[in-house]
A protein has these predicted regions:
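Hydrophobic hinge/microswitch elements
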Residues: 128-141, 146-147, 197-257
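Central regulatory/effector-binding core of bacterial HTH transcription factors
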Residues: 90-153, 221-223
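Secondary-structure junction motif
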Residues: 175, 190-211, 278-287, 292-301
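Short helix-boundary/capping micro-motifs
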Residues: 10-28, 52
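Flexible hinge/capping segments at coil-to-helix
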Residues: 152-191
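A late-sequence structural motif
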Residues: 105, 171, 255-298
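Beta-alpha-beta core module
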Residues: 153-159, 163-164, 178, 225-275
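A short LG(V/I)-centered, amphipathic sequence patch enriched
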Residues: 40-57
Length: 301
């Protein structure tokens, strides 16, 4: 048994899918499957139920996964302690980002991180919030950039910036000529939403509840770009994060309208494990990102 075997086991518990777990570990599916079997043989226990098409862990398997998470956390802590003895801003840094932030934030911050911290080797991963927090908990990620939600309170949260939500409507929509819109104007309206798993979905539902709007039950999107295209086709209206519209204008047939009373917004934060000896590293990275994003948002006004 080695650390890599435990990483395979935890990845399989996270993704509940052999191929996706193997991809996340950068190995082939047969390699991961073979190592899981070897682990079973070594321990003399059955970890998985192999009579189902789904990945189901036995009771023994679930107990081992919990213990593996603990071991991996301690190994990560040991590595961080060793890293902290050398140069603080040197070495690998594994950062996770949510899909409603990553594509729009990375073009701005990657050059900044390379310039500000040239000795950091940055690895980037995109996944939904619950997956990122699981990977952060087990030590597969060093930190994550997410929207603050109750689930992130178990970690140290470093606010990076507050991101406004704009109302996206088609250029053909009756509201397209408005320069701003009060939230109570949305009362009774149906809103296009992302599908389950996206934290932005829950936040948007909260905005709708406040405004008296409701979800359009006929459609759920897997990405902001799908929502944007549905709006451009005049198939509905939705909320869009500020970063996602910075360079859009009406290029795609969509008008973005600021909302008020109240102004919908979310806080984007960098989160990391409590007790990490690399706290100062994460704080410095968060500060560099914050300064860059705030400068960009200020210049766009």
């Amino acid at each position: 048994m080695n650390i890599r075997d435990l990483e395979y086991l935890v990845a399989l518990s996270e993704f509940k899918h052999f191929r996706r777990a193997a991809d996340s570990c950068n190995v082939s599916q047969p390699t991961l499957s073979g190592q899981i079997r070897k682990l079973e043989d070594e321990l003399g226990i059955i970890l998985l139920e192999r009579t189902s098409r789904k990945v189901l862990f036995t009771q023994s398997g679930m107990l081992l996964v919990d213990q593996a998470r603990t071991v991996l956390r301690e190994v990560k802590l040991l590595k961080e302690m060793a890293s902290n003895q050398g140069k603080e801003m040197t070495g690998p840094l594994h950062i996770g980002l949510i899909p409603t932030v990553g594509p729009y934030l990375l073009p701005y911050i990657v050059p900044t991180l390379k310039e500000t911290f040239p000795d950091l080797e940055v690895f980037l991963y995109e996944a939904q919030t619950h997956q990122l927090l699981e990977q952060l908990e087990t030590g597969r990620l060093d930190c994550a950039i997410v929207a603050r939600v109750p689930e992130t309170e178990a970690f140290i949260e470093v606010p990076i910036f507050d991101e406004k939500m704009l109302l996206a409507v088609s250029e053909q929509h009756p509201w397209a000529s408005k320069s701003k819109i009060a939230m109570n104007t949305l009362k009774g309206q149906e809103m296009l939403m992302l599908d389950d798993g996206h934290c932005l979905r829950n936040q948007a539902l909260d905005y709708c509840f406040t405004a008296g709007a409701k979800e359009d039950s006929h459609f759920q999107a897997t990405s902001l770009e799908t929502l944007r295209n549905m709006v451009a086709a005049n198939a509905g209206i939705t909320f869009m994060p500020e970063l996602a519209v910075l360079n859009e204008g009406t290029r795609k047939g969509v008008k973005y309208i600021p909302c008020h009373s109240p102004e919908p917004a979310r806080t984007i934060a960098l989160v990391y494990r409590p007790g990490s000896p690399l706290r100062n590293r994460y704080e410095r990275v968060a500060n560099a990102i914050s300064e860059q994003v705030k400068s960009i948002l200020a210049n766009k006004k």
